[in-house]
């Protein structure tokens, strides 16, 4: 945690020496930003763009990364409600804003409000991460092992989340369509032959 002025100094110095600068802004709904999803996005977007401009003023060639991280606040406790459906929407919308400007982006995803790697943690993380991946997030941080709204970590969760992330990331891949993957010849052979694909060479090669 740094003072506002010291953070700006770090950003300017990093920019001058050519380090990539990830501009992270954390508007928390109802606390440090408006309580509505749209209002939180407006403010967080403006703050992120301002940070990127500051980096470019220090070095016009620096690689600045759009790192907006709008957050849902649990107004009962003041903590982050990272496992909520609204958090998933905020994350996806922030990624889409970066894409609108054609900026490389980074976001937080995979948070949960559960304090244990249980069923609640599983479905909250899965919803959050799937939306982030499907909307095209370039760099996702805090994606594994975190619990209790990013206030705790779990070694068990790291193992579980690693497996989950592999499955979710595969849903973001484009389907490869070419002569080989369409497998017309293999289909023809199976129809005229054994009636299954288990013995086809393509099954072993492409699995």
What do the PLM-derived regions correspond to, one by one?
Residues 1-10, 207:
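Single conserved hydrophobic/aromatic residue that forms the stacking wall/gate
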Residues 156-206:
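Catalytic-core signal marking the mid-to-C-terminal active-site face
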Residues 8-164:
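Glycine-rich anion/phosphate-binding loop at the beta-strand->alpha-helix junction
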């Amino acid at each position: 945690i740094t003072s506002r002025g010291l953070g700006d100094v770090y950003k300017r110095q990093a920019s001058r020496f050519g380090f990539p600068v990830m501009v992270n802004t954390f508007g928390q709904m109802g606390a440090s930003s408006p309580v509505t999803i749209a209002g939180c996005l407006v403010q967080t977007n403006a703050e992120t763009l301002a940070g990127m401009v500051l980096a470019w003023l220090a070095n016009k060639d620096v690689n600045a990364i759009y790192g907006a991280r709008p957050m849902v606040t649990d107004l009962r406790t003041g903590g982050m409600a990272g496992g909520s459906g609204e958090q998933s929407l905020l994350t996806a919308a922030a990624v889409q804003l970066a894409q609108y400007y054609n900026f490389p982006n980074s976001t937080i995803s995979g948070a949960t409000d559960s304090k244990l790697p249980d069923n609640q943690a599983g479905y909250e993380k899965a919803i959050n991460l799937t939306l982030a991946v499907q909307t095209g997030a370039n760099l996702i941080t805090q994606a594994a092992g975190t619990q209790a709204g990013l206030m705790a970590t779990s070694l068990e969760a790291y193992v579980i989340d690693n497996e989950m992330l592999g499955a979710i990331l595969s849903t973001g891949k484009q389907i490869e369509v070419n002569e080989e993957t369409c497998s017309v010849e293999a289909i023809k052979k199976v129809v005229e032959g054994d009636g299954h694909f288990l013995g086809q060479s393509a099954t072993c090669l492409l699995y």
